[in-house]
């Protein structure tokens, strides 16, 4: 018996967002300038005018958010002596997944005497979302680096708490090929993760800030002086590494803590303008 066209038809595959963005910065005549730029798919990079010696790059995901099966790859190289600030146009939204992870991979190379600020705005995890994110940084001789990753579990204004969101966030930082710092953050949608006193303790927002440079101990003293007694945060410095971890009940409270910390620790000494919009 001949099958009808309707019986033969199989479900069309869901469209997925894929993108790649690459940028290379070079020091020329005392200022950091664009050397190379490549963008493909949903990844776009914009270079707003800056008035300091650093170059600012804004990463844009034109798909408007990520869900299961989406993939984005970013790569940035700061050549010798250059200063590069990388941020995002807005908060990245991770929507409910049907089973697959959304994947975001970032690779940064910081040349001799160069500095990179990796300052993306917050990532918002929606209920049922799944995100697998990785950050690899290769530092060469005398290179310095500052990074922040902030996560919001749902949107406070909408009464969301994203209790079943899944996150795996992997950081690997190398100095001249040797591993100097590693982070492995995981959320598996378990109740104890949200309420455990040694974990989130009921908070809906958290952030990690990392600064690598020769003045880590000095900056730790300055950082502790700007963290109020009511802030749920811990900071430490070992060798050239300074790490700050913060939890907060809301995204607004989190920003109030991390914005002055980022301004203190960043190579540019200030936040990208998009953080103020």
Curated annotation (Swiss-Prot):
Belongs to the UreD family. InterPro entries: UreD. Pfam families: UreD. Residues 1-20 are annotated as: Disordered. Required for maturation of urease via the functional incorporation of the urease nickel metallocenter. Keywords: Chaperone, Cytoplasm, Nickel insertion. This is Urease accessory protein UreD. It comes from the Bacteria. The keyword Transferase does not apply. One of its GO terms (molecular function) is nickel cation binding. The keyword Cytoplasm applies. It is found in: Cytoplasm. UreD, UreF and UreG form a complex that acts as a GTP-hydrolysis-dependent molecular chaperone, activating the urease apoprotein by helping to assemble the nickel containing metallocenter of UreC. The UreE protein probably delivers the nickel. GO terms for cellular component: cytoplasm.
